[in-house]
Design a protein with these regions (language model features):
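Compositionally biased, intrinsically disordered low-complexity segments enriched in polar/Pro/Gly
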Residues: 1-160
Length: 162
């Protein structure tokens, strides 16, 4: 059993498919007469995509009770406009109840598309794209100028001839 949480809000139906794309940042360079070489770099930000079904009618059994699709859509809109990262969690549990593993990542909502298709009933489908968010901050550095070295004062003596 899968449970999906977006900023603490559990999706009513776990998406059928979850795609996690880990972007490589390696750089390929072509050498004269030597072919290609690959410079290995740290991976890029992870991108997560899935389609969430938001039931229009409360005819299903839900863990936390029925919520109308507009409550989920309002949450997605606020995540987009607030410009703040949030937690995305996927909990995977075996039929025996044993926890398999989790995906727990700080993300941003990159985009979402709302689709209503009359051929598929009254439910709303939302295609969601999330991107991994890595916290960063600026650091203030104070540059201290070194004090000039004190050189010993040498007095010049003049010799007087008698």
């Amino acid at each position: 059993m899968y449970s999906f949480f977006i900023d603490g809000m559990e999706l009513p139906i776990a998406p059928q498919k979850l795609t996690v794309k880990i972007k490589g940042n390696n750089k390929t360079l072509t050498l004269i007469n030597e072919g290609d070489i690959n410079f290995l770099r740290a991976p890029g930000l992870t991108e997560i995509t899935f389609d969430a079904v938001l039931p229009m009618l409360g005819q299903y059994s839900f863990a936390n009770g029925y919520r109308r699709p507009d409550s989920y859509l309002n949450k997605l809109e606020s995540l987009m406009t607030d410009k703040e990262p949030f937690r995305f969690l996927v909990s995977r549990v075996a039929p025996s109840g044993r926890l398999l593993y989790d995906t727990n990542m700080k993300v941003s909502l990159e985009n979402y598309t709302v689709t209503e298709d009359a051929t598929k009933g009254p439910d709303v489908t939302v295609s969601i794209t999330l991107k991994q968010y890595i916290s960063y901050s600026t650091k203030t550095v104070t540059v201290v100028k070194p004090k000039p070295e004190k050189k010993p004062v040498v007095q010049q003596l003049s010799l007087i001839h008698i």
